[in-house]
């Protein structure tokens, strides 16, 4: 059966005398050889601190060949991910029953997956989440490595998918031998078709020769009934509009810093502290000279001979200045914060905001793209809610990223006080540096007990306690 994606190609007269499988084979070969996939894999290697400095060579065997790796790319990625995803988001929906259902979906496991998707997106430019039901019938989100996905879009803006292919390798055991095979999964509105990639063409997986459903319902008699989503189940979470990963902006600077540091280390290791100038040395060769010097602390020279020494110049200030400049440029290009800045710790609240400007701008775009992805995921949440018989209105859903920013707490609290009467109480509380979502539950309990949640009358002042003790003494 032809997929809707293939029918669309036919209607647009984009194919001629070519089968659907042949098109998939062309796309797979092109994808595997593409620069985009190569860059994604390289980004993963740089995150694991496996950088190009390992390729550094020297022209003479005896020379030192340092290969210093600093983990700079990992630090930049983790800073952005930690800033936007480390703190628990504020997720809300009108209706107590709906909120309980929402909390069961966006639990710690799913929030951890969203954070992992954020790391994948920053590294590789785009991350992909696959909605599915687990063995307990719960809606989950599976992160697929970005380089495994070949998306087929309905539009040039890449807003809606027609289909997609996943290409991945897996170990298999045949006749007592462990082998690695490449598997291909083709997803569209009709379900999933499994293939095996031989390196040149596709073959249907003998274990699954028919299109499978996205999920199954099991009847009382154990019969499995396949179902498919009405939408292609793949959600892109982008780092930015162009799906450019952070390594695109930072690789050359990271390579330069590591090369300069490695070369500088080589120079210091190979440079002798003293250079000997020999005059009329009475010896066979320089090897004998060094041996006599180290062993006997003396050397033989003729009557008009002698030994002078020169102090080697090991000034590295120029190299260190270049490394410092490159480091500054790196954080500029990455739109990140250099935590080694001496002035960072003494900055006031307003100064901290200015220092976070670049990081905020970058994370604003990342947050905007993730809000789009979460909105797409809500469609699957609605289907899940309908199956559970839970009323779910996604138009009343909010997902707020709580950024992990260093702030001046006193200034933040005073800003909250100054906002009374301008903003609603909940908005003010959410901006308080000590706020946690659990506060709402405790405030509600206090109100039910007839206590003023903002009253401090339950606590005596120090001077009141003193007066009580004085009265007790008088009695």
Segments predicted by a language model, with ranges:
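A general structural signal for short secondary-structure junctions and capping/turn motifs
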Residues: 118-123, 155-157, 174-176, 265-268
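C-terminal helix-loop subdomains that flank or include functional centers
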Residues: 285-295, 318-321, 325-475
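Short amphipathic alpha-helical segments
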Residues: 97-98, 105-114, 121, 249, ...
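Extended, regular secondary-structure scaffolds
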Residues: 128-237
